Protein backbone atom coordinates (compact mmCIF):
# COMPACT_ATOMS: atom_id res chain seq x y z
CA UNK A 1 0.00 0.00 0.00
CA UNK A 2 1.12 3.57 -0.62
CA UNK A 3 2.22 5.35 2.54
CA UNK A 4 0.91 8.74 3.56
CA UNK A 5 3.95 10.75 2.40
CA UNK A 6 4.06 9.11 -1.02
CA UNK A 7 0.33 9.62 -1.41
CA UNK A 8 0.79 13.29 -0.55
CA UNK A 9 3.55 13.70 -3.16
CA UNK A 10 1.59 11.94 -5.89
CA UNK A 11 -1.65 13.74 -5.09
CA UNK A 12 -0.27 17.25 -5.49
CA UNK A 13 -3.07 18.81 -3.46
CA UNK A 14 -1.41 22.20 -3.10
CA UNK A 15 -1.97 23.77 0.30
CA UNK A 16 -3.06 20.47 1.84
CA UNK A 17 -1.35 17.48 3.41
CA UNK A 18 -2.60 13.94 3.94
CA UNK A 19 -3.87 13.35 7.44
CA UNK A 20 -4.78 9.69 6.98
CA UNK A 21 -5.76 7.16 4.32
CA UNK A 22 -8.49 4.55 4.68
CA UNK A 23 -7.95 1.64 2.29
CA UNK A 24 -10.99 -0.52 1.53
CA UNK A 25 -10.81 -4.19 2.35
CA UNK A 26 -12.42 -5.34 -0.93
CA UNK A 27 -11.17 -4.37 -4.44
CA UNK A 28 -13.32 -1.93 -6.34
CA UNK A 29 -14.45 -0.10 -3.24
CA UNK A 30 -13.85 3.54 -2.27
CA UNK A 31 -10.46 4.78 -1.14
CA UNK A 32 -10.91 7.64 1.34
CA UNK A 33 -8.14 10.21 1.71
CA UNK A 34 -8.48 12.72 4.53
CA UNK A 35 -6.68 16.00 3.88
CA UNK A 36 -5.67 18.80 6.24
CA UNK A 37 -4.88 22.43 5.32
CA UNK A 38 -1.19 23.32 5.59
CA UNK A 39 -0.93 26.59 3.64
CA UNK A 40 0.29 29.54 5.66
CA UNK A 41 -0.75 32.02 2.96
CA UNK A 42 -4.50 32.06 2.36
CA UNK A 43 -5.90 33.87 -0.69
CA UNK A 44 -9.44 35.08 -1.31
CA UNK A 45 -10.99 33.19 -4.23
CA UNK A 46 -12.84 36.26 -5.48
CA UNK A 47 -10.25 39.05 -5.38
CA UNK A 48 -6.99 37.18 -4.67
CA UNK A 49 -6.14 39.25 -1.58
CA UNK A 50 -4.23 37.67 1.31
CA UNK A 51 -6.40 36.83 4.29
CA UNK A 52 -5.45 36.10 7.87
CA UNK A 53 -8.67 35.03 9.53
CA UNK A 54 -10.61 31.80 8.94
CA UNK A 55 -14.33 32.47 9.15
CA UNK A 56 -15.45 28.82 9.14
CA UNK A 57 -14.40 25.38 7.91
CA UNK A 58 -16.63 22.72 6.38
CA UNK A 59 -15.58 19.27 5.17
CA UNK A 60 -16.39 18.62 1.53
CA UNK A 61 -16.31 15.21 -0.19
CA UNK A 62 -14.49 15.58 -3.51
CA UNK A 63 -13.89 12.96 -6.20
CA UNK A 64 -10.41 12.59 -7.70
CA UNK A 65 -8.92 10.35 -10.40
CA UNK A 66 -9.03 6.61 -9.57
CA UNK A 67 -5.98 4.88 -8.10
CA UNK A 68 -5.58 1.37 -9.48
CA UNK A 69 -9.00 -0.27 -9.07
CA UNK A 70 -10.13 2.14 -6.35
CA UNK A 71 -12.42 5.12 -6.75
CA UNK A 72 -10.93 8.00 -4.76
CA UNK A 73 -12.86 10.30 -2.43
CA UNK A 74 -11.08 13.22 -0.82
CA UNK A 75 -12.31 14.62 2.47
CA UNK A 76 -11.33 18.27 2.12
CA UNK A 77 -11.68 20.83 4.94
CA UNK A 78 -12.83 23.81 2.84
CA UNK A 79 -12.02 27.11 4.53
CA UNK A 80 -14.05 30.28 4.25
CA UNK A 81 -11.87 33.29 4.93
CA UNK A 82 -12.71 36.75 6.13
CA UNK A 83 -11.60 39.05 3.32
CA UNK A 84 -11.04 42.68 4.25
CA UNK A 85 -11.01 43.71 0.57
CA UNK A 86 -14.38 42.10 -0.21
CA UNK A 87 -15.80 42.95 3.19
CA UNK A 88 -17.10 39.49 4.05
CA UNK A 89 -16.50 35.73 4.09
CA UNK A 90 -15.10 34.20 0.90
CA UNK A 91 -13.87 30.74 -0.08
CA UNK A 92 -10.14 30.09 -0.09
CA UNK A 93 -8.60 29.96 -3.56
CA UNK A 94 -7.31 26.48 -4.45
CA UNK A 95 -5.27 25.70 -7.56
CA UNK A 96 -6.71 22.19 -7.97
CA UNK A 97 -10.36 22.63 -7.01
CA UNK A 98 -12.87 25.08 -8.42
CA UNK A 99 -15.56 26.93 -6.55
CA UNK A 100 -18.52 24.68 -5.67
CA UNK A 101 -16.92 21.76 -7.55
CA UNK A 102 -17.20 18.23 -6.19
CA UNK A 103 -14.46 16.87 -8.47
CA UNK A 104 -10.83 17.93 -8.82
CA UNK A 105 -9.68 19.90 -11.86
CA UNK A 106 -7.68 16.94 -13.18
CA UNK A 107 -10.68 14.61 -13.01
CA UNK A 108 -12.72 17.25 -14.83
CA UNK A 109 -9.98 17.48 -17.47
CA UNK A 110 -9.90 13.69 -17.87
CA UNK A 111 -13.68 13.68 -18.40
CA UNK A 112 -13.36 16.40 -21.04
CA UNK A 113 -10.67 14.47 -22.92
CA UNK A 114 -12.77 11.31 -23.01
CA UNK A 115 -15.85 13.24 -24.09
CA UNK A 116 -14.11 14.24 -27.31
CA UNK A 117 -14.49 10.65 -28.52
CA UNK A 118 -17.31 9.36 -26.34
CA UNK A 119 -20.60 10.46 -24.76
CA UNK A 120 -21.65 11.70 -21.34
CA UNK A 121 -23.29 8.43 -20.33
CA UNK A 122 -20.19 6.34 -21.11
CA UNK A 123 -17.80 8.73 -19.33
CA UNK A 124 -20.07 8.92 -16.28
CA UNK A 125 -20.15 5.12 -16.12
CA UNK A 126 -16.36 4.86 -16.55
CA UNK A 127 -15.56 7.22 -13.66
CA UNK A 128 -18.64 6.24 -11.61
CA UNK A 129 -19.92 9.80 -11.64
CA UNK A 130 -23.43 11.13 -12.06
CA UNK A 131 -24.60 11.92 -15.59
CA UNK A 132 -25.42 15.50 -14.66
CA UNK A 133 -22.02 15.92 -12.98
CA UNK A 134 -20.15 14.97 -16.16
CA UNK A 135 -22.45 17.08 -18.32
CA UNK A 136 -21.96 20.12 -16.05
CA UNK A 137 -18.17 19.69 -16.18
CA UNK A 138 -18.16 19.46 -19.95
CA UNK A 139 -20.49 22.42 -20.33
CA UNK A 140 -18.24 24.58 -18.15
CA UNK A 141 -15.22 23.51 -20.23
CA UNK A 142 -17.00 24.36 -23.47
CA UNK A 143 -18.03 27.79 -22.20
CA UNK A 144 -14.41 28.54 -21.38
CA UNK A 145 -12.88 27.08 -24.55
CA UNK A 146 -15.28 28.07 -27.34
CA UNK A 147 -13.81 31.29 -28.69
CA UNK A 148 -15.88 34.19 -29.89
CA UNK A 149 -15.57 35.16 -33.57
CA UNK A 150 -13.32 38.00 -34.66
CA UNK A 151 -16.07 39.97 -36.40
CA UNK A 152 -13.60 42.53 -37.75
CA UNK A 153 -12.31 39.91 -40.23
CA UNK A 154 -15.60 38.33 -41.31
CA UNK A 155 -17.01 39.49 -44.66
CA UNK A 156 -18.99 36.44 -45.80
CA UNK A 157 -21.71 34.37 -44.15
CA UNK A 158 -23.63 31.19 -44.88
CA UNK A 159 -26.99 30.58 -43.18
CA UNK A 160 -28.99 27.37 -43.08
CA UNK A 161 -31.32 25.38 -40.87
CA UNK A 162 -31.05 21.96 -39.26
CA UNK A 163 -33.51 19.72 -37.44
CA UNK A 164 -33.34 19.81 -33.65
CA UNK A 165 -35.78 16.97 -33.06
CA UNK A 166 -38.31 14.98 -34.95
CA UNK A 167 -41.54 16.88 -35.31
CA UNK A 168 -40.40 19.86 -37.38
CA UNK A 169 -38.36 21.66 -34.71
CA UNK A 170 -35.47 23.53 -36.28
CA UNK A 171 -32.53 25.77 -35.47
CA UNK A 172 -30.55 28.23 -37.59
CA UNK A 173 -26.77 27.99 -37.94
CA UNK A 174 -24.60 30.86 -39.22
CA UNK A 175 -21.16 29.97 -40.54
CA UNK A 176 -18.07 31.77 -41.78
CA UNK A 177 -17.58 29.87 -45.07
CA UNK A 178 -14.03 31.20 -45.47
CA UNK A 179 -12.74 30.48 -41.96
CA UNK A 180 -14.98 27.40 -41.52
CA UNK A 181 -16.18 28.54 -38.10
CA UNK A 182 -19.67 28.21 -36.64
CA UNK A 183 -20.41 31.77 -35.60
CA UNK A 184 -23.86 31.54 -34.07
CA UNK A 185 -26.74 29.10 -33.50
CA UNK A 186 -30.30 30.00 -32.56
CA UNK A 187 -33.57 28.11 -32.16
CA UNK A 188 -36.10 28.44 -34.98
CA UNK A 189 -35.86 29.40 -38.66
CA UNK A 190 -38.08 32.47 -38.79
CA UNK A 191 -37.38 36.17 -39.29
CA UNK A 192 -37.20 36.53 -35.51
CA UNK A 193 -34.36 34.00 -35.39
CA UNK A 194 -32.39 35.76 -38.14
CA UNK A 195 -33.07 39.12 -36.47
CA UNK A 196 -31.70 37.80 -33.16
CA UNK A 197 -28.43 36.96 -34.92
CA UNK A 198 -27.99 40.43 -36.41
CA UNK A 199 -28.98 42.17 -33.18
CA UNK A 200 -26.22 40.44 -31.20
CA UNK A 201 -23.50 41.53 -33.65
CA UNK A 202 -21.00 44.14 -32.41
CA UNK A 203 -21.24 47.64 -33.94
CA UNK A 204 -20.06 47.76 -37.54
CA UNK A 205 -20.01 43.99 -38.10
CA UNK A 206 -23.21 43.90 -40.17
CA UNK A 207 -21.92 46.69 -42.41
CA UNK A 208 -18.77 44.69 -43.25
CA UNK A 209 -20.70 41.73 -44.68
CA UNK A 210 -20.27 41.54 -48.48
CA UNK A 211 -22.42 38.49 -49.28
CA UNK A 212 -24.51 35.81 -47.59
CA UNK A 213 -25.14 32.32 -48.98
CA UNK A 214 -28.61 30.99 -48.16
CA UNK A 215 -31.26 28.68 -49.52
CA UNK A 216 -34.43 30.25 -50.91
CA UNK A 217 -35.79 31.07 -47.45
CA UNK A 218 -37.49 34.47 -47.59
CA UNK A 219 -37.22 35.04 -43.83
CA UNK A 220 -33.42 35.05 -43.94
CA UNK A 221 -33.28 37.31 -46.99
CA UNK A 222 -35.60 39.93 -45.50
CA UNK A 223 -33.51 40.26 -42.34
CA UNK A 224 -30.26 40.39 -44.32
CA UNK A 225 -31.69 43.26 -46.39
CA UNK A 226 -32.84 45.03 -43.22
CA UNK A 227 -29.54 44.80 -41.31
CA UNK A 228 -26.93 44.46 -44.09
CA UNK A 229 -28.46 46.17 -47.13
CA UNK A 230 -25.07 46.29 -48.86
CA UNK A 231 -24.68 42.48 -48.71
CA UNK A 232 -25.54 40.45 -51.80
CA UNK A 233 -27.67 37.33 -51.51
CA UNK A 234 -26.18 34.18 -53.06
CA UNK A 235 -28.60 31.30 -53.54
CA UNK A 236 -27.12 27.89 -52.97
CA UNK A 237 -26.98 25.46 -55.90
CA UNK A 238 -27.76 22.41 -53.77
CA UNK A 239 -31.05 23.78 -52.45
CA UNK A 240 -32.25 25.09 -55.83
CA UNK A 241 -31.52 21.80 -57.58
CA UNK A 242 -33.14 19.84 -54.74
CA UNK A 243 -36.23 22.04 -55.09
CA UNK A 244 -36.20 21.43 -58.87
CA UNK A 245 -36.06 17.70 -58.22
CA UNK A 246 -39.05 17.78 -55.88
CA UNK A 247 -41.25 20.20 -57.80
CA UNK A 248 -40.40 19.35 -61.41
CA UNK A 249 -38.77 15.94 -61.92
CA UNK A 250 -40.85 14.20 -59.27
CA UNK A 251 -44.07 15.84 -60.47
CA UNK A 252 -43.42 14.89 -64.11
CA UNK A 253 -42.51 11.34 -63.09
CA UNK A 254 -45.81 10.92 -61.23
CA UNK A 255 -47.81 12.45 -64.10
CA UNK A 256 -46.15 10.16 -66.63
CA UNK A 257 -46.79 7.12 -64.45
CA UNK A 258 -50.47 8.07 -64.11
CA UNK A 259 -50.80 8.21 -67.90
CA UNK A 260 -49.66 4.59 -68.13
CA UNK A 261 -52.32 3.00 -65.95
CA UNK A 262 -53.15 0.53 -68.72
CA UNK A 263 -49.50 -0.45 -69.22
CA UNK A 264 -48.55 -1.79 -65.81
CA UNK A 265 -44.96 -2.89 -66.59
CA UNK A 266 -44.08 0.53 -68.06
CA UNK A 267 -45.87 2.30 -65.21
CA UNK A 268 -43.94 0.26 -62.65
CA UNK A 269 -40.62 1.20 -64.28
CA UNK A 270 -41.39 4.93 -64.12
CA UNK A 271 -42.78 4.79 -60.58
CA UNK A 272 -39.63 3.05 -59.34
CA UNK A 273 -37.26 5.46 -61.10
CA UNK A 274 -37.34 8.31 -58.58
CA UNK A 275 -33.93 7.57 -57.13
CA UNK A 276 -32.36 7.20 -60.60
CA UNK A 277 -33.74 10.53 -61.78
CA UNK A 278 -32.81 12.56 -58.71
CA UNK A 279 -29.30 11.23 -58.17
CA UNK A 280 -26.30 12.71 -59.96
CA UNK A 281 -25.24 10.66 -62.96
CA UNK A 282 -21.65 10.58 -61.66
CA UNK A 283 -22.86 8.59 -58.65
CA UNK A 284 -24.51 5.84 -60.72
CA UNK A 285 -22.80 2.57 -61.56
CA UNK A 286 -22.76 1.27 -65.14
CA UNK A 287 -25.93 -0.81 -64.81
CA UNK A 288 -27.87 2.07 -63.25
CA UNK A 289 -26.65 4.46 -65.96
CA UNK A 290 -27.91 2.08 -68.66
CA UNK A 291 -31.33 1.88 -66.97
CA UNK A 292 -31.48 5.67 -66.77
CA UNK A 293 -30.60 6.09 -70.46
CA UNK A 294 -33.26 3.58 -71.49
CA UNK A 295 -35.85 5.36 -69.35
CA UNK A 296 -35.04 8.81 -70.77
CA UNK A 297 -35.03 7.57 -74.37
CA UNK A 298 -38.49 6.11 -73.87
CA UNK A 299 -40.04 9.19 -72.25
CA UNK A 300 -39.62 12.64 -73.80
CA UNK A 301 -41.00 14.75 -70.87
CA UNK A 302 -38.65 13.05 -68.41
CA UNK A 303 -35.74 13.55 -70.81
CA UNK A 304 -36.59 17.26 -71.12
CA UNK A 305 -36.72 17.99 -67.40
CA UNK A 306 -33.61 15.87 -66.77
CA UNK A 307 -31.53 17.71 -69.39
CA UNK A 308 -32.78 21.12 -68.19
CA UNK A 309 -31.75 20.24 -64.65
CA UNK A 310 -28.15 19.78 -65.83
CA UNK A 311 -28.38 23.06 -67.75
CA UNK A 312 -29.70 24.79 -64.63
CA UNK A 313 -26.68 23.62 -62.60
CA UNK A 314 -24.28 25.26 -65.06
CA UNK A 315 -25.62 28.72 -64.16
CA UNK A 316 -23.67 28.57 -60.89
CA UNK A 317 -20.31 28.11 -62.59
CA UNK A 318 -20.14 31.22 -64.76
CA UNK A 319 -17.62 33.85 -63.71
CA UNK A 320 -19.21 36.77 -65.56
CA UNK A 321 -22.76 37.92 -64.75
CA UNK A 322 -23.45 38.80 -68.41
CA UNK A 323 -22.68 35.26 -69.53
CA UNK A 324 -24.75 33.81 -66.69
CA UNK A 325 -27.71 36.04 -67.62
CA UNK A 326 -27.46 34.97 -71.27
CA UNK A 327 -27.42 31.30 -70.21
CA UNK A 328 -30.41 31.97 -67.94
CA UNK A 329 -32.40 33.54 -70.78
CA UNK A 330 -31.71 30.48 -72.94
CA UNK A 331 -32.71 28.11 -70.13
CA UNK A 332 -35.85 30.09 -69.34
CA UNK A 333 -36.90 30.09 -73.01
CA UNK A 334 -36.49 26.31 -73.21
CA UNK A 335 -38.53 25.85 -70.03
CA UNK A 336 -41.32 28.08 -71.35
CA UNK A 337 -41.45 26.24 -74.68
CA UNK A 338 -41.37 22.76 -73.14
CA UNK A 339 -45.13 22.62 -72.61
CA UNK A 340 -44.58 20.98 -69.20
CA UNK A 341 -46.73 22.69 -66.58
CA UNK A 342 -44.54 21.87 -63.56
CA UNK A 343 -41.44 23.15 -65.38
CA UNK A 344 -43.19 26.36 -66.48
CA UNK A 345 -44.33 27.07 -62.91
CA UNK A 346 -40.85 26.47 -61.48
CA UNK A 347 -39.22 28.72 -64.10
CA UNK A 348 -41.67 31.55 -63.35
CA UNK A 349 -40.93 31.32 -59.63
CA UNK A 350 -37.17 31.02 -60.08
CA UNK A 351 -37.14 34.17 -62.22
CA UNK A 352 -37.74 36.23 -59.08
CA UNK A 353 -34.59 34.76 -57.53
CA UNK A 354 -32.29 35.44 -60.50
CA UNK A 355 -30.34 38.13 -58.62
CA UNK A 356 -29.11 35.52 -56.13
CA UNK A 357 -27.94 33.24 -58.95
CA UNK A 358 -26.06 36.00 -60.78
CA UNK A 359 -24.43 37.12 -57.50
CA UNK A 360 -22.66 33.75 -57.45
CA UNK A 361 -20.42 35.06 -60.26
CA UNK A 362 -19.08 37.82 -57.98
CA UNK A 363 -19.06 35.81 -54.75
CA UNK A 364 -18.29 32.09 -55.23
CA UNK A 365 -20.11 31.01 -52.09
CA UNK A 366 -22.29 28.03 -51.25
CA UNK A 367 -23.67 26.32 -48.17
CA UNK A 368 -21.71 23.09 -48.67
CA UNK A 369 -19.79 23.70 -45.45
CA UNK A 370 -23.14 24.09 -43.67
CA UNK A 371 -24.29 20.77 -45.10
CA UNK A 372 -21.09 19.21 -43.75
CA UNK A 373 -21.79 20.78 -40.37
CA UNK A 374 -25.34 19.41 -40.46
CA UNK A 375 -23.91 15.91 -40.94
CA UNK A 376 -21.63 16.44 -37.93
CA UNK A 377 -24.63 17.65 -35.92
CA UNK A 378 -26.37 14.34 -36.62
CA UNK A 379 -23.33 12.48 -35.31
CA UNK A 380 -23.24 14.64 -32.15
CA UNK A 381 -26.94 13.99 -31.52
CA UNK A 382 -26.53 10.27 -32.12
CA UNK A 383 -23.52 10.06 -29.80
CA UNK A 384 -25.39 11.80 -27.01
CA UNK A 385 -28.76 10.10 -27.58
CA UNK A 386 -30.20 13.59 -28.01
CA UNK A 387 -29.67 16.74 -25.96
CA UNK A 388 -32.23 18.19 -23.61
CA UNK A 389 -30.01 21.17 -22.77
CA UNK A 390 -30.10 23.34 -25.90
CA UNK A 391 -27.23 25.59 -24.83
CA UNK A 392 -25.02 22.55 -24.22
CA UNK A 393 -25.93 21.12 -27.63
CA UNK A 394 -25.12 24.40 -29.39
CA UNK A 395 -21.78 24.66 -27.55
CA UNK A 396 -20.92 21.14 -28.73
CA UNK A 397 -21.54 22.19 -32.32
CA UNK A 398 -19.48 25.37 -32.04
CA UNK A 399 -16.62 23.45 -30.41
CA UNK A 400 -16.60 20.98 -33.31
CA UNK A 401 -16.05 23.85 -35.79
CA UNK A 402 -13.71 26.37 -34.11
CA UNK A 403 -12.49 27.73 -37.46
CA UNK A 404 -9.18 27.81 -39.29
CA UNK A 405 -6.24 29.67 -37.81
CA UNK A 406 -6.05 33.14 -39.35
Swiss-Prot record:
Keywords: DNA recombination, DNA-binding, Transposable element, Transposition
Keyword field contains Iron: no
Region forming the signal peptide: none
Gene Ontology biological process terms from the UniProt entry: DNA recombination; transposition
Pfam family, one: HTH_Tnp_ISL3
InterPro entries: Transpos_ISL3 (IPR047951), Transposase_DDE (IPR002560), Transposase_HTH (IPR032877), Transposase_Znf (IPR029261)
Top-level taxonomic group: Bacteria
Sample GO molecular function, one term: DNA binding
Keyword check for DNA-binding: yes
Family: Belongs to the transposase 12 family.
Function, as annotated: Involved in the transposition of the insertion sequence.
Name of the protein described by the UniProt record: Transposase for insertion sequence element IS1001
Source organism per UniProt: Bordetella parapertussis
Gene: tnpA
Amino acid sequence: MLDRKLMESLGGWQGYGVERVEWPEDPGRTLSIYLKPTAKVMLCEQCGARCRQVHETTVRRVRDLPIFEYRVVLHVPRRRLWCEQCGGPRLERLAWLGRYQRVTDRLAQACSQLLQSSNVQAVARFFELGWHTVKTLDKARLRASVREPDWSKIEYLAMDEFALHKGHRYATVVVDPIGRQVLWIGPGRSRETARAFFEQLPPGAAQRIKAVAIDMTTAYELEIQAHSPQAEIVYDLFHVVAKYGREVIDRVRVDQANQLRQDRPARRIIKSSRWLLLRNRDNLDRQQAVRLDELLQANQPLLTVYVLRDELKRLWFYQRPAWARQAWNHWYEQAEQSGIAALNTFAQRLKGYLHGILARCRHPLNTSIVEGINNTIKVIKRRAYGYRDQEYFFLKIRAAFPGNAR
